[in-house]
């Protein structure tokens, strides 16, 4: 989900069959449409019980500024957590979730790299999530 509409669709879909809490781990890419960041935060706040904001592909942009943009219009949400290290964000969110909860890790999908500070680094959301679940994903 790289767009507000995409994030909204997937969260609405997951919400429809989630018995427990819905957790959302996401960030926005750097050097991309800055205008969508706040709206993605608002959508996550409306549809998810717990939000973890993290780095996606910040590229050459300041990751703190990206997260601040996302967070800027999230008002009175009871659980918004910021962890810039994406692997740690996924691991800790999975560990905080309970049986019956659903954790959405949005943004990178099939990508097996992350652009940070102008460097392409090997990284897989899927591999990190599987490891966090003890290989059960």
Report the location of each language-model feature.
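ATP-dependent carboxylate-amine ligase
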Residues: 1-137
């Amino acid at each position: 989900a790289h767009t507000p509409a995409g994030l909204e669709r997937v969260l609405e879909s997951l919400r429809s069959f989630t018995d427990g809490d819905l957790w959302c781990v996401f960030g926005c890419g750097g050097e991309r449409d800055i205008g969508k960041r706040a709206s993605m935060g608002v959508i996550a706040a409306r549809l998810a019980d717990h939000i973890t904001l993290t780095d996606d592909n910040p590229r050459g942009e300041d990751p703190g500024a990206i997260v601040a943009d996302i967070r800027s219009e999230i008002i009175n949400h009871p659980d918004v957590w910021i962890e810039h290290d994406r692997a740690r964000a996924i691991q800790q969110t999975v560990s905080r979730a309970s049986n019956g909860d659903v954790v959405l890790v949005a943004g990178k999908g099939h990508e097996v790299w992350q652009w940070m500070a102008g460097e392409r680094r090997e990284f897989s959301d899927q591999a990190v999530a599987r490891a966090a679940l003890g290989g059960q994903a």
